[in-house]
């Protein structure tokens, strides 16, 4: 899952209005933000296998430290503790968002999501069908966008256009990821992931800066 995680990040603004959208996105996508660094370091492995599933050409060979249920619970507690003073609900919301990544990925992934490092792997395999994946992910994303729009108000043109450009831009990025060719190399995967997520975090911070919680 990709864009559905951002949907939860958007929606979480209602529960923790004092937390920047960038931090909520970081929490919801913490697993995928950490993963490219671990791939670059050789700690986790991925293989390019066109046709591996209908949705992605990537075969996630091993990612126990970024994507296992146990480790995401640990990362969630640590990240929530780091931002606990930002908002009275920050700890609980951020920790839950980090852990939610595993729950959502289990729905879409084939059985490659570890329960703990070295443990059994699970997955319901929705990625075997592009239409079914879209039927789950897109409503989740649009619901999150709608909740964020109702929970905040734009301050001037920047507030309105920043938010619009963010949610439309993420949607277009999702479409490009699905329709585009497989990545040319493992290096392209982790480098693109690092740069891409950094850009999204900066973009979401800027857009949210001109919104007021209501």
Language-model features: where?
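N-terminal membrane-targeting hydrophobic helices
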Residues: 1-214
């Amino acid at each position: 899952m990709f864009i559905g995680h951002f949907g939860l990040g958007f929606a979480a603004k209602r529960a923790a209005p004092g937390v920047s959208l960038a931090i909520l996105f970081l929490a919801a996508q913490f697993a995928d933000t950490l993963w490219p660094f671990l791939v670059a370091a050789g700690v986790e492995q991925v293989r390019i296998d066109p046709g591996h599933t209908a949705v992605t050409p990537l075969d996630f060979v091993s990612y126990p430290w970024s994507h296992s249920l146990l480790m995401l619970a640990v990362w969630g507690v640590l990240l929530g503790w780091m931002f606990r003073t930002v908002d009275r609900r920050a700890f609980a919301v951020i920790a839950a968002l980090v852990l939610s990544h595993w729950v959502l990925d289990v729905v879409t992934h084939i059985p490659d999501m570890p329960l703990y490092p070295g443990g059994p792997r699970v997955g319901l395999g929705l990625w075997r069908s592009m239409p079914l994946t879209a039927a789950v992910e897109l409503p989740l994303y649009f619901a999150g966008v709608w909740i964020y729009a109702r929970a905040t108000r734009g301050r001037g043109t920047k507030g309105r256009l920043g938010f619009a450009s963010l949610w439309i831009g993420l949607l277009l990025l999702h479409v490009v990821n699905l329709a585009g060719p497989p990545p040319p190399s493992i290096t392209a995967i982790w480098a693109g992931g690092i740069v891409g997520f950094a850009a999204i975090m900066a973009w979401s911070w800027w857009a949210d800066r001109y919104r007021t919680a209501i």
